[in-house]
Swiss-Prot record:
Keywords: Disulfide bond, Glycoprotein, Heparin-binding, Repeat, Secreted, Signal, Sushi. This is Beta-2-glycoprotein 1. Residues 263-345 are annotated as: Sushi-like. Its main location: secreted. It is found in: Secreted.
Length: 345
């Protein structure tokens, strides 16, 4: 017969053994929660793993029951981030990103000539969608340009309906008698506006003066304006120093003011000189005189080295100075050699 004490002791040990088979707090899984979450569980109690918002379960079981052994089964459940739709290409722009997974943020930029129509960044949400919506790169446009007073639009071709695209240009012209101050060409900028407009102003010039020993012709009208022209000429024996035609400039003055300079009489009876790179007889080439500004080179002798060299002489308003080294060759001194026939130094 079994002792009652032994039976009581055995029951106690059995109770202690069963009570000691509780399950511990379950392992933490990244990006997941456990319900209910306690420090220990009695055999038969159930727990459920759930992925946090923005994550989805991959493989493994979600529900577990605490076994009599007190050991939770190995959990192979994984919670992985939701993946938003591919957004790595932005037409006429660029996307900066690492991944398209929750909760990453991507940013956007547009090429020159385009602007972001939408936000410059978007975040992958818990639902696996981009927020805010993905932007687009739209072309920068400028409205039709304003036309300055006293100007006309000379060149303008809209390329976006009525508007112009970035770097498109427009060219202006001023009305007659008006001068342009500023650039005649404006450009559509990255800000969607045009560069600075030019200004057209009426410009008058005084009547040009007649030069001494010459004459001037200009339009027969009460006032001379921008771009009007005047022509000059000189009387016989004089030549024009400056342009034959001048123009009224945007500053209200003339582009030049020529004068009439006297011609020069040939200073010697006979000599071979260099004119514009060629040897010529001065008495033949300039039988009617040398014009103001004409330049010739006279031949001179170096007696010590027995060679020749040249020195220049120029007609300046009726005066020309012959180089002192030049010796005019007399036709009677036929035994002497002219300097132009001596070998150069």
């Amino acid at each position: 017969m079994i002792s009652p004490v032994l039976i009581l002791f055995s029951s106690f040990l059995c109770h202690v053994a069963i009570a000691g088979r509780t399950c511990p707090k379950p392992d933490d899984l990244p990006f997941s929660t456990v319900v209910p979450l306690k420090t220990f569980y009695e055999p038969g109690e159930e727990i459920t793993y759930s992925c946090k918002p923005g994550y989805v379960s991959r493989g493994g079981m979600r529900k577990f029951i605490c076994p009599l052994t007190g050991l939770w089964p190995i959990n192979t459940l994984k919670c992985t981030p939701r993946v938003c739709p591919f957004a790595g290409i932005l037409e006429n722009g660029a996307v900066r990103y690492t991944t398209f997974e929750y909760p990453n943020t991507i940013s956007f930029s547009c090429n020159t000539g385009f602007y972001l129509n939408g936000a410059d960044s978007a975040k992958c949400t818990e639902e696996g969608k981009w927020s805010p919506e993905l932007p687009v790169c739209a072309p920068i446009t400028c409205p039709p340009p304003s036309i300055p007073t006293f100007a006309t639009l000379h060149v303008y071709k809209p390329s976006a309906g009525n508007n112009s695209l970035y770097r498109d240009t427009a060219v202006f012209e001023c009305l007659p008698q008006h001068a342009m101050f500023g650039n005649d060409t404006i450009t559509c900028t990255t800000h969607g506006n045009w560069t600075k407009l030019p200004e057209c102003r009426e410009v008058k010039c005084p009547f040009p003066s007649r030069p001494d020993n010459g004459f001037v012709n200009y339009p027969a009208k009460p006032t001379l304006y921008y771009k009007d022209k005047a022509t000059f000429g000189c009387h016989d024996g004089y030549s024009l120093d400056g342009p034959e035609e001048i123009e009224c400039t945007k500053l209200g003055n003339w582009s030049a003011m020529p004068s009439c300079k006297a011609s020069c009489k040939v200073p010697v009876k006979k000599a071979t000189v260099v004119y514009q790179g060629e040897r010529v007889k001065i008495q033949e080439k300039f039988k009617n005189g040398m014009l103001h500004g004409d330049k010739v080179s006279f031949f001179c002798k170096n007696k010590e080295k027995k060679c020749s060299y040249t020195e220049d002489a120029q007609c300046i308003d009726g005066t020309i100075e012959v180089p002192k080294c030049f010796k005019e060759h007399s036709s009677l001194a036929f035994w002497k050699t002219d300097a132009s026939d001596v070998k150069p130094c």
